[in-house]
Regions:
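Serine-esterase "nucleophile elbow" of acetyl-processing enzymes
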Residues: 1-55, 66-74
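Alpha-helical cap/lid subdomain in secreted, periplasmic
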Residues: 33-45, 61-208
């Protein structure tokens, strides 16, 4: 039976309350739903799922921990969902400002190092934002960051999941954003399951 090690990297959306003492604990977010679906639908493989999302992480912080939390583990597939905190912190009380150029440099550095120091396939998910009363000023920022992520995905990723576009389509059917997220960023169980389903669907070409 072929073994496949899948690593989830990201911020609080990926972390989702996982047990930090056990990186095989998937937490309560999309990694839990994705891993359950992937394992159930691909029983010819022996999967090892690792969740190393850390709440609050920005692109720079993910790069800083990349050796310990990715390179040393030598996974077969690395997925990355990062970037919304770089935008969010432009508007919070701490005023930690990361420019678009810095986000691109940080993200490119992450991807370059993964390519250089592992043989892992890369699955990238775009940052996303659902409508929320206090997040309107973040949408204009995200509209310039998403094309950066898309272009990096074209250059480095084996699979790209345009979550912001996918949520926009889903909201045409279920037009209430709170069905997926109370604050527009952190998914509730419905949102986590939805992302997990998109993830499990997107990863299929990497399991052949």
């Amino acid at each position: 039976m072929r073994k496949i090690k899948i690593l989830f990297l990201g911020d609080s959306i990926t972390d989702a309350g996982r047990d930090k003492r056990n990186y095989h604990n998937m937490g309560n977010g999309y990694p839990r739903y994705a891993s359950e679906l992937i394992a159930a639908e691909n029983q010819d493989f022996d999967f090892e799922f690792i969740n190393l999302g850390i709440s609050g992480n920005r692109t720079s912080q993910l790069f800083d921990r990349l050796y310990k939390d990715a390179i040393e583990l030598q996974p077969d597939i690395i997925s990355i969902l990062i970037g919304i905190n770089d935008i969010w912190h432009r508007h919070d009380i701490n005023n930690i400002s990361t420019t678009d150029a810095q986000i691109e440099l940080n993200y490119r550095s992450i991807l370059e190092r993964i390519k250089r120091e592992t043989n892992a396939k890369i699955l990238m998910l775009s940052p996303y934002l659902l409508d929320a009363p206090d997040k309107g000023n973040m949408r204009s920022d995200l509209s310039t960051v998403i094309p950066i992520v898309e272009n990096l995905a074209k250059e480095y990723a084996d699979v790209y999941v345009p979550l912001d576009d996918i949520f926009a389509e889903a909201l045409k059917v279920q037009p209430e954003p709170k069905f997926y997220s109370g604050d527009g960023v952190h998914p509730n169980p419905n949102g986590s399951q939805f992302i997990g389903e998109q993830y499990a669907k997107a990863i299929k070409p990497l399991l052949k």
